[in-house]
Amino acid sequence: LDHFNYHSDGRLLVEDTAIEDIIKKSGTPAYVYSRATIERHWKAFDNAAGSHPHLICYAVKANSNLGVLNLMARLGSGFDIVSVGELLRVIQAGGDPKKVVFSGVGKTEIEISTALQAGIHCFNVESISELYRINEVAGCLNKKAPISIRINPNIDAGTHPYISTGLKENKFGIEIEQASTVYNIASELPFLEVKGVDCHIGSQLTEIEPFLEALDKLLILIDSLATQGITIEHLDLGGGLGVPYNGETPPQPAQYMHAIIERMNGRKLKLIFEPGRAIMANAGVLVTKVEFLKLNDHKNFAIVDAAMNDLIRPALYSAWQNIIPLNNKLNDPETRPSRVYDVVGPICETGDFLGKDRSLTIAEGDHLVIRSAGAYGATMSSNYNSRCRPAEIMVDGDKAFVVRQREKHIELWRGEHVLP
Protein backbone atom coordinates (compact mmCIF):
# COMPACT_ATOMS: atom_id res chain seq x y z
CA LEU A 1 0.00 0.00 0.00
CA ASP A 2 1.10 3.57 -0.58
CA HIS A 3 0.03 7.10 0.35
CA PHE A 4 -0.80 8.48 -3.12
CA ASN A 5 -4.55 9.03 -3.49
CA TYR A 6 -6.98 11.31 -5.30
CA HIS A 7 -8.92 13.86 -3.24
CA SER A 8 -12.64 14.23 -3.93
CA ASP A 9 -11.87 17.44 -5.84
CA GLY A 10 -9.68 15.50 -8.28
CA ARG A 11 -6.27 16.56 -6.99
CA LEU A 12 -3.67 13.85 -6.43
CA LEU A 13 -2.39 13.89 -2.86
CA VAL A 14 0.73 12.38 -1.39
CA GLU A 15 -0.05 11.90 2.29
CA ASP A 16 -1.68 15.23 3.24
CA THR A 17 -0.09 17.32 0.50
CA ALA A 18 -1.40 18.12 -2.99
CA ILE A 19 1.26 17.37 -5.58
CA GLU A 20 0.13 20.37 -7.65
CA ASP A 21 1.17 22.61 -4.74
CA ILE A 22 4.60 20.99 -4.67
CA ILE A 23 5.32 21.48 -8.36
CA LYS A 24 4.22 25.12 -8.25
CA LYS A 25 7.41 25.63 -6.23
CA SER A 26 9.68 22.92 -7.61
CA GLY A 27 8.74 22.93 -11.27
CA THR A 28 8.85 19.80 -13.41
CA PRO A 29 10.03 17.20 -14.00
CA ALA A 30 10.23 16.31 -10.32
CA TYR A 31 10.40 13.16 -8.26
CA VAL A 32 8.08 13.12 -5.24
CA TYR A 33 8.48 10.58 -2.42
CA SER A 34 6.30 9.65 0.55
CA ARG A 35 8.04 9.21 3.90
CA ALA A 36 5.10 7.29 5.34
CA THR A 37 5.15 4.81 2.45
CA ILE A 38 8.90 4.24 2.71
CA GLU A 39 8.67 3.58 6.44
CA ARG A 40 5.60 1.37 6.05
CA HIS A 41 7.31 -0.78 3.43
CA TRP A 42 10.55 -1.15 5.41
CA LYS A 43 8.66 -2.10 8.56
CA ALA A 44 6.64 -4.67 6.58
CA PHE A 45 9.87 -6.64 6.09
CA ASP A 46 11.27 -6.06 9.56
CA ASN A 47 8.04 -6.91 11.38
CA ALA A 48 7.42 -10.01 9.27
CA ALA A 49 10.74 -11.51 10.38
CA GLY A 50 9.49 -11.30 13.96
CA SER A 51 11.84 -12.74 16.56
CA HIS A 52 13.93 -14.69 14.05
CA PRO A 53 17.48 -13.25 13.99
CA HIS A 54 17.61 -10.97 10.98
CA LEU A 55 18.94 -7.81 9.39
CA ILE A 56 17.11 -5.80 6.74
CA CYS A 57 19.75 -4.28 4.45
CA TYR A 58 18.15 -1.73 2.14
CA ALA A 59 19.57 -1.98 -1.40
CA VAL A 60 21.08 1.47 -1.85
CA LYS A 61 21.17 1.17 -5.66
CA ALA A 62 17.36 1.41 -5.78
CA ASN A 63 17.41 5.00 -4.54
CA SER A 64 20.54 6.48 -2.98
CA ASN A 65 19.26 9.95 -2.08
CA LEU A 66 20.60 11.05 1.32
CA GLY A 67 17.07 11.86 2.46
CA VAL A 68 15.97 8.30 1.74
CA LEU A 69 19.07 6.76 3.32
CA ASN A 70 18.64 8.89 6.43
CA LEU A 71 15.08 7.60 6.88
CA MET A 72 16.43 4.05 6.67
CA ALA A 73 19.15 4.83 9.19
CA ARG A 74 16.58 6.24 11.63
CA LEU A 75 14.64 2.98 11.34
CA GLY A 76 17.77 1.03 12.25
CA SER A 77 18.18 -0.41 8.78
CA GLY A 78 21.24 -2.08 7.39
CA PHE A 79 22.41 -1.34 3.86
CA ASP A 80 23.40 -3.37 0.81
CA ILE A 81 26.00 -1.46 -1.21
CA VAL A 82 27.82 -2.11 -4.50
CA SER A 83 30.43 0.68 -4.51
CA VAL A 84 32.49 2.81 -2.16
CA GLY A 85 30.41 5.78 -3.28
CA GLU A 86 27.32 4.08 -1.88
CA LEU A 87 29.20 3.34 1.36
CA LEU A 88 30.16 6.99 1.74
CA ARG A 89 26.57 8.03 1.05
CA VAL A 90 25.34 5.68 3.78
CA ILE A 91 27.84 7.07 6.28
CA GLN A 92 27.03 10.67 5.29
CA ALA A 93 23.33 9.93 5.83
CA GLY A 94 23.93 8.58 9.34
CA GLY A 95 23.90 4.87 8.52
CA ASP A 96 25.85 2.37 10.62
CA PRO A 97 28.71 0.79 8.61
CA LYS A 98 28.55 -2.22 10.94
CA LYS A 99 25.21 -3.00 9.26
CA VAL A 100 26.56 -2.74 5.70
CA VAL A 101 27.02 -5.67 3.32
CA PHE A 102 29.18 -5.01 0.26
CA SER A 103 28.06 -6.78 -2.93
CA GLY A 104 29.25 -6.48 -6.53
CA VAL A 105 31.59 -8.33 -8.90
CA GLY A 106 34.33 -5.71 -9.31
CA LYS A 107 35.46 -4.40 -5.93
CA THR A 108 38.70 -2.44 -6.23
CA GLU A 109 41.54 -2.47 -3.70
CA ILE A 110 40.63 1.07 -2.63
CA GLU A 111 36.98 0.08 -2.13
CA ILE A 112 37.93 -2.98 -0.09
CA SER A 113 40.35 -0.98 2.04
CA THR A 114 37.83 1.80 2.67
CA ALA A 115 35.13 -0.71 3.64
CA LEU A 116 37.46 -2.61 5.98
CA GLN A 117 38.52 0.57 7.74
CA ALA A 118 34.87 1.61 8.08
CA GLY A 119 34.14 -1.72 9.78
CA ILE A 120 31.42 -3.10 7.50
CA HIS A 121 29.39 -6.17 8.43
CA CYS A 122 30.42 -8.38 5.52
CA PHE A 123 31.78 -8.62 1.97
CA ASN A 124 29.66 -10.68 -0.42
CA VAL A 125 32.43 -12.26 -2.50
CA GLU A 126 31.77 -13.07 -6.15
CA SER A 127 34.95 -14.87 -7.35
CA ILE A 128 38.07 -16.71 -6.20
CA SER A 129 40.22 -13.82 -7.41
CA GLU A 130 38.23 -11.48 -5.18
CA LEU A 131 38.86 -13.74 -2.18
CA TYR A 132 42.61 -13.40 -2.70
CA ARG A 133 42.35 -9.64 -3.21
CA ILE A 134 40.36 -9.10 0.00
CA ASN A 135 42.79 -11.32 1.92
CA GLU A 136 45.75 -9.31 0.61
CA VAL A 137 44.22 -5.92 1.40
CA ALA A 138 43.12 -7.09 4.86
CA GLY A 139 46.64 -8.37 5.52
CA CYS A 140 48.13 -4.97 4.67
CA LEU A 141 45.76 -3.42 7.21
CA ASN A 142 46.33 -6.24 9.72
CA LYS A 143 42.59 -6.84 9.85
CA LYS A 144 40.32 -9.85 9.45
CA ALA A 145 37.82 -9.37 6.65
CA PRO A 146 34.34 -10.82 7.27
CA ILE A 147 33.15 -12.55 4.10
CA SER A 148 30.29 -14.51 2.67
CA ILE A 149 30.38 -16.07 -0.77
CA ARG A 150 27.69 -15.31 -3.29
CA ILE A 151 26.36 -18.58 -4.64
CA ASN A 152 24.84 -18.81 -8.09
CA PRO A 153 22.24 -21.59 -7.65
CA ASN A 154 21.32 -21.75 -11.37
CA ILE A 155 17.70 -20.79 -10.69
CA ASP A 156 15.59 -19.22 -13.43
CA ALA A 157 13.92 -16.30 -11.69
CA GLY A 158 11.52 -15.75 -14.60
CA THR A 159 12.29 -12.04 -14.87
CA HIS A 160 13.76 -9.65 -17.47
CA PRO A 161 17.13 -11.01 -18.71
CA TYR A 162 18.90 -7.76 -17.76
CA ILE A 163 17.89 -8.18 -14.10
CA SER A 164 18.14 -11.98 -13.84
CA THR A 165 21.24 -12.80 -11.81
CA GLY A 166 20.99 -16.44 -10.69
CA LEU A 167 21.69 -18.42 -13.87
CA LYS A 168 25.02 -19.96 -14.89
CA GLU A 169 25.33 -17.57 -17.83
CA ASN A 170 25.09 -14.52 -15.52
CA LYS A 171 28.26 -12.78 -14.30
CA PHE A 172 27.37 -13.04 -10.63
CA GLY A 173 28.60 -15.38 -7.92
CA ILE A 174 30.22 -18.80 -7.68
CA GLU A 175 28.52 -21.80 -9.30
CA ILE A 176 27.01 -23.91 -6.57
CA GLU A 177 28.96 -26.96 -7.74
CA GLN A 178 32.21 -25.11 -6.90
CA ALA A 179 31.01 -23.64 -3.62
CA SER A 180 32.49 -26.20 -1.26
CA THR A 181 35.94 -25.87 -2.82
CA VAL A 182 35.84 -22.08 -2.65
CA TYR A 183 34.70 -22.07 0.98
CA ASN A 184 37.62 -24.32 1.89
CA ILE A 185 40.02 -21.93 0.16
CA ALA A 186 38.48 -19.01 2.04
CA SER A 187 38.70 -20.78 5.40
CA GLU A 188 42.45 -21.27 4.93
CA LEU A 189 43.28 -17.68 4.00
CA PRO A 190 44.71 -15.99 7.12
CA PHE A 191 43.00 -12.61 6.87
CA LEU A 192 39.51 -13.81 6.00
CA GLU A 193 36.75 -14.78 8.40
CA VAL A 194 33.97 -16.85 6.84
CA LYS A 195 30.64 -15.53 8.08
CA GLY A 196 27.89 -16.40 5.66
CA VAL A 197 26.35 -17.64 2.45
CA ASP A 198 24.92 -15.11 0.01
CA CYS A 199 22.53 -15.43 -2.92
CA HIS A 200 20.56 -13.04 -5.13
CA ILE A 201 18.74 -14.63 -8.05
CA GLY A 202 17.20 -11.58 -9.72
CA SER A 203 14.93 -8.58 -9.47
CA GLN A 204 11.19 -8.00 -9.85
CA LEU A 205 10.26 -11.60 -8.94
CA THR A 206 6.52 -12.13 -8.58
CA GLU A 207 6.46 -15.67 -7.16
CA ILE A 208 7.87 -17.20 -3.99
CA GLU A 209 8.88 -20.54 -5.48
CA PRO A 210 12.23 -19.44 -7.03
CA PHE A 211 13.30 -18.04 -3.64
CA LEU A 212 12.40 -21.30 -1.91
CA GLU A 213 14.14 -23.37 -4.57
CA ALA A 214 17.31 -21.35 -4.04
CA LEU A 215 16.95 -21.59 -0.25
CA ASP A 216 16.71 -25.39 -0.38
CA LYS A 217 19.98 -25.59 -2.31
CA LEU A 218 21.71 -23.20 0.08
CA LEU A 219 20.61 -25.10 3.19
CA ILE A 220 22.05 -28.31 1.73
CA LEU A 221 25.32 -26.45 1.11
CA ILE A 222 25.38 -25.05 4.66
CA ASP A 223 24.87 -28.54 6.12
CA SER A 224 27.67 -29.88 3.92
CA LEU A 225 30.03 -27.11 5.00
CA ALA A 226 29.29 -27.88 8.67
CA THR A 227 30.55 -31.44 8.18
CA GLN A 228 33.79 -29.92 6.84
CA GLY A 229 34.23 -27.77 9.94
CA ILE A 230 33.05 -24.53 8.32
CA THR A 231 30.37 -22.85 10.42
CA ILE A 232 28.01 -20.43 8.70
CA GLU A 233 26.60 -17.64 10.90
CA HIS A 234 24.21 -15.97 8.47
CA LEU A 235 22.34 -16.60 5.24
CA ASP A 236 21.88 -13.58 2.96
CA LEU A 237 18.99 -14.18 0.56
CA GLY A 238 19.40 -10.89 -1.27
CA GLY A 239 16.43 -8.95 -2.56
CA GLY A 240 14.34 -9.23 -5.68
CA LEU A 241 10.76 -9.25 -4.41
CA GLY A 242 8.64 -7.64 -7.12
CA VAL A 243 6.10 -4.84 -7.04
CA PRO A 244 2.83 -4.35 -8.95
CA TYR A 245 3.69 -2.14 -11.94
CA ASN A 246 0.99 -3.45 -14.28
CA GLY A 247 -1.38 -5.82 -12.53
CA GLU A 248 1.27 -8.20 -11.20
CA THR A 249 0.42 -9.82 -7.86
CA PRO A 250 3.76 -10.43 -6.14
CA PRO A 251 3.77 -11.87 -2.63
CA GLN A 252 3.47 -9.40 0.21
CA PRO A 253 6.61 -9.09 2.35
CA ALA A 254 4.89 -11.00 5.17
CA GLN A 255 4.00 -13.91 2.86
CA TYR A 256 7.54 -13.99 1.51
CA MET A 257 9.23 -13.79 4.91
CA HIS A 258 6.95 -16.33 6.54
CA ALA A 259 7.54 -18.80 3.70
CA ILE A 260 11.31 -18.40 4.04
CA ILE A 261 11.33 -18.77 7.82
CA GLU A 262 9.00 -21.78 7.67
CA ARG A 263 11.35 -23.43 5.16
CA MET A 264 14.20 -22.95 7.65
CA ASN A 265 12.65 -25.73 9.76
CA GLY A 266 13.53 -24.18 13.10
CA ARG A 267 17.10 -23.24 12.25
CA LYS A 268 18.13 -20.06 14.07
CA LEU A 269 20.58 -19.06 11.36
CA LYS A 270 20.58 -15.27 11.05
CA LEU A 271 18.83 -14.12 7.88
CA ILE A 272 19.81 -11.05 5.86
CA PHE A 273 17.42 -9.55 3.31
CA GLU A 274 18.25 -6.85 0.76
CA PRO A 275 14.97 -5.27 -0.41
CA GLY A 276 15.22 -2.17 -2.58
CA ARG A 277 12.51 -1.96 -5.22
CA ALA A 278 9.91 -3.46 -2.86
CA ILE A 279 10.47 -0.59 -0.43
CA MET A 280 10.96 2.33 -2.80
CA ALA A 281 9.20 1.77 -6.14
CA ASN A 282 5.67 2.65 -5.06
CA ALA A 283 6.90 5.24 -2.56
CA GLY A 284 7.73 7.67 -5.37
CA VAL A 285 6.34 9.23 -8.54
CA LEU A 286 7.73 11.34 -11.37
CA VAL A 287 5.65 14.42 -12.21
CA THR A 288 5.90 15.83 -15.73
CA LYS A 289 4.23 18.56 -17.79
CA VAL A 290 2.54 17.99 -21.15
CA GLU A 291 4.30 20.42 -23.49
CA PHE A 292 2.63 19.44 -26.77
CA LEU A 293 0.01 17.05 -28.13
CA LYS A 294 0.96 15.82 -31.59
CA LEU A 295 -1.90 14.12 -33.44
CA ASN A 296 -0.90 12.02 -36.45
CA ASP A 297 -2.92 9.70 -38.66
CA HIS A 298 -1.49 6.53 -37.14
CA LYS A 299 -0.12 7.61 -33.76
CA ASN A 300 -0.76 10.34 -31.20
CA PHE A 301 2.06 11.68 -29.06
CA ALA A 302 1.96 13.44 -25.70
CA ILE A 303 5.31 15.22 -25.58
CA VAL A 304 6.28 15.87 -21.96
CA ASP A 305 9.16 17.61 -20.23
CA ALA A 306 10.49 14.40 -18.63
CA ALA A 307 12.60 12.06 -20.71
CA MET A 308 14.65 8.87 -20.75
CA ASN A 309 17.49 10.69 -18.99
CA ASP A 310 15.14 11.22 -16.02
CA LEU A 311 13.53 7.76 -16.07
CA ILE A 312 15.27 5.18 -18.24
CA ARG A 313 13.40 2.02 -17.21
CA PRO A 314 10.84 2.13 -20.06
CA ALA A 315 13.55 2.66 -22.68
CA LEU A 316 16.05 0.22 -21.14
CA TYR A 317 13.79 -2.64 -20.07
CA SER A 318 10.56 -1.89 -21.97
CA ALA A 319 9.20 -1.46 -18.45
CA TRP A 320 5.54 -0.56 -17.99
CA GLN A 321 4.71 2.11 -15.41
CA ASN A 322 1.24 3.49 -14.84
CA ILE A 323 0.71 7.06 -16.05
CA ILE A 324 -2.15 9.03 -14.52
CA PRO A 325 -3.35 12.65 -14.61
CA LEU A 326 -2.36 14.98 -11.80
CA ASN A 327 -6.04 15.95 -11.55
CA ASN A 328 -8.57 13.28 -12.53
CA LYS A 329 -11.49 15.73 -12.67
CA LEU A 330 -10.03 17.58 -15.67
CA ASN A 331 -11.94 15.47 -18.18
CA ASP A 332 -14.25 17.79 -20.13
CA PRO A 333 -14.64 16.00 -23.51
CA GLU A 334 -14.81 19.36 -25.30
CA THR A 335 -11.33 20.45 -24.21
CA ARG A 336 -9.82 17.06 -23.37
CA PRO A 337 -11.12 14.34 -25.68
CA SER A 338 -9.99 10.87 -24.67
CA ARG A 339 -7.27 9.57 -26.97
CA VAL A 340 -4.57 6.92 -27.00
CA TYR A 341 -1.09 8.44 -26.79
CA ASP A 342 2.52 7.46 -26.66
CA VAL A 343 3.99 9.53 -23.83
CA VAL A 344 7.41 10.66 -25.05
CA GLY A 345 10.16 13.05 -24.02
CA PRO A 346 12.18 15.68 -25.89
CA ILE A 347 15.37 13.61 -26.31
CA CYS A 348 16.49 12.97 -29.88
CA GLU A 349 15.96 9.20 -29.88
CA THR A 350 12.96 7.11 -30.90
CA GLY A 351 13.55 5.09 -27.74
CA ASP A 352 12.80 8.11 -25.58
CA PHE A 353 9.40 7.11 -24.28
CA LEU A 354 7.81 6.82 -20.84
CA GLY A 355 4.73 4.89 -21.89
CA LYS A 356 3.12 3.62 -25.08
CA ASP A 357 -0.54 3.32 -26.07
CA ARG A 358 -1.95 5.04 -22.99
CA SER A 359 -5.57 6.17 -22.94
CA LEU A 360 -5.50 9.70 -21.53
CA THR A 361 -7.84 12.67 -21.24
CA ILE A 362 -5.38 15.56 -21.38
CA ALA A 363 -4.64 18.97 -22.87
CA GLU A 364 -1.40 20.83 -23.45
CA GLY A 365 -0.18 22.32 -20.18
CA ASP A 366 -1.64 19.52 -18.04
CA HIS A 367 0.54 17.43 -15.76
CA LEU A 368 0.97 13.67 -15.70
CA VAL A 369 2.22 11.45 -12.90
CA ILE A 370 4.33 8.37 -13.59
CA ARG A 371 3.73 5.88 -10.81
CA SER A 372 6.15 3.38 -9.26
CA ALA A 373 9.11 5.68 -9.92
CA GLY A 374 10.71 5.67 -6.48
CA ALA A 375 13.18 2.90 -7.35
CA TYR A 376 15.64 2.92 -10.25
CA GLY A 377 14.37 6.34 -11.30
CA ALA A 378 16.46 9.25 -10.04
CA THR A 379 19.33 6.91 -9.22
CA MET A 380 19.65 5.91 -12.90
CA SER A 381 19.16 9.42 -14.27
CA SER A 382 21.78 11.08 -16.46
CA ASN A 383 22.63 14.32 -18.21
CA TYR A 384 22.08 12.95 -21.71
CA ASN A 385 21.35 15.77 -24.19
CA SER A 386 22.84 18.09 -21.52
CA ARG A 387 19.60 17.99 -19.57
CA CYS A 388 19.58 18.89 -15.89
CA ARG A 389 18.51 16.13 -13.55
CA PRO A 390 15.17 16.72 -11.79
CA ALA A 391 14.45 17.87 -8.27
CA GLU A 392 13.59 15.29 -5.62
CA ILE A 393 10.98 16.11 -2.97
CA MET A 394 10.18 14.17 0.21
CA VAL A 395 6.69 14.61 1.66
CA ASP A 396 6.10 14.11 5.37
CA GLY A 397 2.42 14.59 6.16
CA ASP A 398 1.51 18.14 5.14
CA LYS A 399 5.12 19.23 4.65
CA ALA A 400 7.35 18.89 1.58
CA PHE A 401 11.14 18.98 1.74
CA VAL A 402 13.56 19.34 -1.15
CA VAL A 403 15.97 16.42 -0.69
CA ARG A 404 17.76 17.14 -3.96
CA GLN A 405 17.74 20.48 -5.70
CA ARG A 406 17.11 20.60 -9.41
CA GLU A 407 20.44 20.65 -11.20
CA LYS A 408 21.54 23.99 -12.64
CA HIS A 409 22.89 24.29 -16.16
CA ILE A 410 26.22 25.59 -14.88
CA GLU A 411 26.64 22.29 -13.01
CA LEU A 412 26.53 20.36 -16.28
CA TRP A 413 30.14 21.21 -17.12
CA ARG A 414 31.57 21.28 -13.61
CA GLY A 415 34.98 19.62 -13.67
CA GLU A 416 35.37 19.98 -17.44
CA HIS A 417 38.13 22.04 -19.06
CA VAL A 418 39.03 23.33 -22.51
CA LEU A 419 42.52 22.99 -23.94
CA PRO A 420 44.90 25.94 -23.45
Regions found by a protein language model. Give the residues of each.
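Active-site loop/helix belt of alpha/beta enzymes
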Residues: 1, 153-294, 354, 358, ...
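A charged N-terminal "starter" segment
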Residues: 1-145, 184, 189-193, 220-223, ...
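Charged (often Lys/Glu-rich) extended helix/loop segments that serve as interaction or gating elements
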Residues: 23, 259, 268-420
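Conserved, mostly hydrophobic/aromatic
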Residues: 38, 61, 83, 115, ...
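Glycine- and other small-residue-rich loops at beta-strand/loop junctions that grip anionic moieties
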Residues: 57-58, 79, 103-104, 123-126, ...
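Active-site-proximal loop/turn and secondary-structure-junction residues that shape catalytic pockets
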Residues: 62-64, 85-86, 106-107, 127-129, ...
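Short acidic, glycine/serine/threonine-rich loops at helix termini
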Residues: 69, 92-93, 112-117, 134-137, ...
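Hydrophobic residues within beta-strands of alpha/beta enzymes
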Residues: 79-80, 100, 123, 197, ...
